[in-house]
């Protein structure tokens, strides 16, 4: 019961964070006039469809314009555009929460739909696929290497990987992406420079999957090289620090095998901060993936954010993406809280 109560409290806290961010976002939209702009665009879309239907029945252009103008005024009243923006706060919160933000100005889905909700939901799985794959790879590489280096402090491999970790942390991901494209796509020509599929994309499930995997190799390698260094360094440092604590010395004095000491007394204690860095690193990588996806022409949320910002900004798309990124962060924090309760029983009391 105590565990369930703590989970409920954590979930409520994360929910309040999400609602607070939503409220602040909607207040900013209203104060800057963007909420009015979004609603007027929705009215404009509805009137456009109405005009297309009524043009077949009302032949007199003047009469058609009078009817359209009356309907436009009715729709503006319906959406509350005749009232101050702060009276529409609850409605706008629901709209952002459900991504009911109308149509994008120039952006579309692959099927040609301009609906913002459909555009974002089409791009979301692509971003999750790319960054989650890279995340799993650098976890499988970084944690074992970090643990290994903590037992070989000062050796050649330790010094070499420490230098690599510093370089990996310092090099911008977008610069590394351009460098990898120059080597593997332009010079060696063994990997595609970008995109998710060949042009034209192959037909069939397995052929399409293999083509997607082929196009994923270079961006995943780039993300792994950019992120695995800090994972190795943090794991090594946390493991090494924990190994010097008194309870580890006592466990060794009792004659426990080194493997048992490492598993029960070192990694178990070092796991919570390591997991924290990994989960928050994933959310930070996704949120900072705008330039990475743009360089590799990967049709994810980062590339969508870039397309919405350049040229004539598409405010509604930017708002929807901001909410999705916030939602991802809140979900990651909740998962982190759950893992903390599992990995560190002391947090439960």
Predicted features, each with a name:
Residues 3-4, 124-125, 129, 133-157, ...:
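Alpha-helical transmembrane segments of integral membrane proteins
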């Amino acid at each position: 019961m105590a565990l369930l109560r703590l989970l409920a409290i954590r979930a409520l806290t994360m929910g309040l964070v999400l609602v607070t961010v939503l409220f602040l976002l909607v207040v900013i939209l209203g104060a800057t006039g963007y909420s009015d702009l979004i609603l007027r665009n929705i009215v404009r879309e509805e009137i456009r469809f109405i005009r297309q239907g009524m043009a077949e029945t009302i032949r007199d252009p003047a009469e058609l314009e009078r009817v359209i103008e009356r309907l436009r005024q009715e729709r503006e009243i319906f959406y509350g555009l005749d009232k101050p923006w702060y009276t529409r706060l609850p409605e706008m919160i629901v709209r952002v929460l459900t991504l009911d933000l109308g149509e994008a100005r120039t952006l579309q889905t692959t099927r040609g739909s301009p609906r913002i909700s459909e555009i974002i939901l089409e791009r979301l799985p692509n971003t999750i696929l790319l960054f989650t794959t890279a995340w799993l790879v650098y976890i499988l590489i970084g944690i074992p290497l970090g643990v290994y280096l903590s037992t070989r402090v000062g050796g050649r491999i330790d010094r070499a990987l420490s230098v690599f970790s510093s370089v990996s942390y310092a090099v911008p991901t977008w610069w590394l992406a351009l460098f990898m494209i120059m080597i593997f796509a332009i010079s060696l020509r063994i990997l595609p420079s970008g995109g998710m599929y060949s042009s034209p994309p192959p037909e069939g499930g397995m052929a399409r999957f293999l083509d997607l995997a082929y196009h994923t190799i270079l961006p995943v390698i780039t993300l792994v090289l950019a992120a695995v260094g800090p994972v190795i360094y943090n794991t090594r440092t946390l493991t090494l620090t924990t190994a010097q604590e008194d309870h580890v010395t006592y466990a060794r004095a009792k004659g426990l095998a080194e493997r048992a000491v490492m598993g029960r007394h070192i990694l178990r204690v070092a796991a919570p901060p390591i997991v924290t860095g990994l989960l928050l690193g994933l959310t930070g990588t996704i949120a900072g993936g705008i330039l990475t996806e743009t360089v590799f022409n990967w049709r994810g949320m980062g590339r969508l954010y870039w397309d919405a910002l350049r040229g004539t900004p598409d405010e509604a798309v930017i708002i929807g993406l901001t909410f999705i990124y916030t939602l991802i962060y809140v979900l990651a924090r909740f998962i982190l809280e759950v893992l903390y309760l599992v990995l560190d029983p002391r947090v439960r009391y």
